[in-house]
Amino acid sequence: MEGLELTAFQIISAVGTARSSYIEAIQKAKAFDFEGAEALIKEGDEMFVEGHNAHAGLLQQEAEGGPGSTLSLLILHAEDQLMSAEGFKTIALEFIDVYKKFEKIGKEL
């Protein structure tokens, strides 16, 4: 496996791991473990950047007139995973904020 296929799998692997980290961060926040949640967001961000950089490399290669990407289900899946991970991060950050507010209200009661 090389070229486009390898890059697609790199994207899928990295952003899939990022998405999993964001989902785990929600679980940590639900247990009021905000340090753990924030650590998982950071881990997810690192993996997301790895996937994003691989994707950007494909775009740059095509823009420079290199061998164009062939649109395949694999590349579509990689881009879908990239966008999904980005959405999960947004959701995870919102959930963490909500759980922080729940904890604060609980302490005030």
PLM regions and their residue ranges:
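Terminal alpha-helical segments
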Residues: 1-109
